[in-house]
């Protein structure tokens, strides 16, 4: 296993003492070892900047064309590669949260990573996932936001850049920012005649590796293990996590930490379905 994020590589080494090779080192070692066929399976959720860099630069340009054109390569897609993928993952996630979604006084919020560069159009996958989930949930009480894409942050991008307004001032117009998480949860309350204090919120990351974002941006807490009660965990210095914002708004946030619902629900990136790989043979190198 390798990571496209150097942050992940550094954190894994810091926490385990095990140094992980960067991707180019792995690919060179595999090629030098004499393998004839190599499968590269992405763990990315959306086809954003890092996924495209992985497949188009690291795998295609360097490994397949420059370094080892004689090796056949199977390229695995990201989790939400097609509309059918979105539908399948939504069904599995809905079953995972079905009991919580049965009551109007409960809402589930999923935090995706997001892609800051809109040129890739990958963030639409999160909107598609939310739509698919809400078609299954009779109460339309499950929402998807991101930690790194302006329109789908907890508050809109221009407000995120003003620390004094992290909790919106009176007069915030939700209709101007319908895709931010604040607008979604407050509009849900208004539509259903509920005060935030009457609503239970269940938080979970929608990422393949969610350590730092789950702990800091979602929960604002020190490191936790699966199913830990966050009431017993020390708050860290992150003052603007989703959890804290929701609690300041009056919502009741469930205190059970969940780090990886896609894995627990059995929907982990299509790997269980045989990698969903596309095969590129050495004979077809000119067509890549």
Regions found by a protein language model. Name each.
Residues 1-7, 145-148:
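A short beta-strand-loop structural module common to alpha/beta enzyme folds
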Residues 38-43, 108-111, 201-209, 279:
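Short, structured motif recognition centered on aromatic/hydrophobic residues
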Residues 280-288:
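Conserved small/polar residues in nucleotide/adenosyl-binding loops
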């Amino acid at each position: 296993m390798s990571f496209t994020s150097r942050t992940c590589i550094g954190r894994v080494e810091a926490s385990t003492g095990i140094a992980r090779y960067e991707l180019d080192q792995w690919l060179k070692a595999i090629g030098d070892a004499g393998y004839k066929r190599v499968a590269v399976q992405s763990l990315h959720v959306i086809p954003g900047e890092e996924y495209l860099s992985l497949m188009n630069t690291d795998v295609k340009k360097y490994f397949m064309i420059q370094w080892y054109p004689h090796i056949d390569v199977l390229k695995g897609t990201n989790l939400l590669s097609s509309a059918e993928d979105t539908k399948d993952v939504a069904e599995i996630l809905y079953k995972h949260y079905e009991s919580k979604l049965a009551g109007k006084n409960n809402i589930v919020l999923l935090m995706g990573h997001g892609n800051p560069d809109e040129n890739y159009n990958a963030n639409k996958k999160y909107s598609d996932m939310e739509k698919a989930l809400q078609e299954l949930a009779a109460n339309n009480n499950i929402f998807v936001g991101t930690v790194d894409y302006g329109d789908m942050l907890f508050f809109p991008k221009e407000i995120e850049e003003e620390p004094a307004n992290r909790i919106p001032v009176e007069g915030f117009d939700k209709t101007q920012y319908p895709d931010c998480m604040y607008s979604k949860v407050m509009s849900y309350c208004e539509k259903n005649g509920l005060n935030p204090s009457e609503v239970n919120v269940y938080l979970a990351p929608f990422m393949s590796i969610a350590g730092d974002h789950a702990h800091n941006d979602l929960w604002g807490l020190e490191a936790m293990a699966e199913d830990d009660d966050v009431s017993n965990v020390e708050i860290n210095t992150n003052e603007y996590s989703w959890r804290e914002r929701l609690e300041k708004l009056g919502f009741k946030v469930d205190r059970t930490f969940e780090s990886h619902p896609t894995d627990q629900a059995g929907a982990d990136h299509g790997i269980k379905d045989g990698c969903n790989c596309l095969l590129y043979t050495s004979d077809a190198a000119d067509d890549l």
